[in-house]
Design a protein with these regions (language model features):
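Acidic-leaning, charged glycine-interspersed low-complexity segments
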Residues: 87-142
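Acidic, Ser/Thr- and Gly-enriched intrinsically disordered low-complexity segments
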Residues: 42-44, 69-103
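Oligomerization/assembly interface segments of phage tail-like spikes and tubes
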Residues: 62-81, 125-137
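Residue-level signal for secondary-structure boundary sites
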Residues: 41, 82, 137-141
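Small/polar-rich, solvent-exposed N-terminal microdomains that initiate assembly or binding
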Residues: 1-55, 156-158
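C-terminal tail/extension regions appended to the core domain(s) of diverse proteins
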Residues: 4, 8, 124-158
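C-terminal basic regulatory modules in eukaryotic proteins
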Residues: 52-72, 86, 155-158
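Short structured motifs
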Residues: 17-19, 57-59, 111-117
Length: 158
C-alpha cells in the first residue's frame, strides 16, 4: 500500500494488485503494485544494530533488526485507446521517481521490465515491471528489553 501511495504522490496512477474493493476501469495507464518476494538476513551481530537517543523520553533505545529485500511487482496496464506508447511513458515516469528519491524507507537496487504486450481478452496493454528494493526491518527495545515498535527503513538511513 505504501509503494502505491508513493507512486501516486509522484503523479503515477497506482493501485494495489489485490484491492479490498472492486477495480474500476481506467482511461489512462495504471500500475498494479504487489510484493512478489521478500527475504531477510542479518543486519548486524545477533541482529543488534546499535542504539539511538529518543528526545521525547530522553532515554537510549536499543535497535535490533534484519536486512530485508523486497521484490515489488509494478505491472503497468493501459486501455487499448492509449496505445503502447502510454505504457512506455508511464514506465519512464516510474523509473525516474524510483531512481531519484525512491519509496520512503527503501533503496532501489534494480528495476527491470518485460516487453509491452496486448491482452486481447482484457483489451489492455500490459508490461511486467519489477523493482528490487533493500531496507531494514527493525524493532526498538526499551530498557527492560521489551520491543516497542517495528519499522522498515532504507539501507542508507540507519
Amino acid at each position: 500500500e505504501r509503494m502505491a501511495e508513493y507512486l501516486k504522490e509522484q503523479g503515477i496512477d497506482a493501485v494495489c494488485a489485490y484491492p479490498d474493493s472492486p477495480r474500476t476501469r481506467r482511461e489512462a495507464p495504471v500500475a498494479a503494485v504487489s510484493i512478489r518476494a521478500c527475504s531477510g538476513g542479518p543486519g548486524g551481530f545477533q541482529d543488534y544494530l546499535g542504539e539511538r537517543y529518543n528526545q521525547e523520553t530522553q532515554t537510549w533505545q536499543e535497535l535490533y533488526g534484519r536486512r530485508v529485500e523486497f521484490t515489488f511487482g509494478l505491472d503497468l496496464y493501459a486501455p487499448a485507446g492509449c496505445g503502447a506508447e502510454a505504457i512506455q511513458q508511464a514506465f519512464d515516469k516510474m523509473a525516474q521517481a524510483l531512481r531519484s528519491q525512491g519509496a520512503p524507507g527503501l533503496r532501489m537496487v534494480e528495476l527491470s521490465c518485460g516487453e509491452t504486450e496486448f491482452d486481447q481478452k482484457a483489451g489492455l496493454y500490459k508490461r511486467t515491471v519489477e523493482a528490487l528494493c533493500q531496507g531494514y526491518l527493525y524493532a526498538v527495545a526499551d530498557e527492560g528489553g521489551a520491543f516497542l515498535d517495528f519499522i522498515v527503513r532504507g539501507e542508507g538511513r540507519i
